[in-house]
Amino acid sequence: MALQTIAENAAIVPELWMHSMIDLVRATAIVDKALAQARTLGLPPLTVAVLDAGGCLVSFKREDGSSLLRPEIAQAKAWGALGMGIGSRAIAQRASVAPAFVSAVNALAGGRLIPVPGGVLIRMSDKSIIGAVGITGATSDQDEACAVAGIEAAGFTADTGADPAANKG
């Protein structure tokens, strides 16, 4: 009996794991759609990073002409959103009213938090977080718009942090 239960649970775990993290196929689709949106809008070269819910890099592209620090900036936007559980627009808003707090969190995070728009959480329909997108290269608002386009094209909900009540689960 106990062995059968263990075997049954082991078969379920991979299925649960796959639903709690963004997969490579969809992460790459997000990156590609975000870059396509940037080209449609005539934006400067972008760098796009998609992290899973654990903060690990899943998909990444840096367009020709992107500057040296763009990969780190894109990942920091996404990582900060994951670490705080809110889109980086909300982190920017907090930084404007509580700069000491955001500065302390950034120090705690080893400088891996960029408090400007462009770090967007990827949510499932049940509002669970499965990853985040970080984009840099244009204005922060344009970076964020491209992230939202990519996330929504992949069938997920984008959480920019603009409406903190919208994604409470």
What are these model-derived regions, one by one?
Residues 2-169:
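Flexible, solvent-exposed loop/hinge segments and secondary-structure transition points
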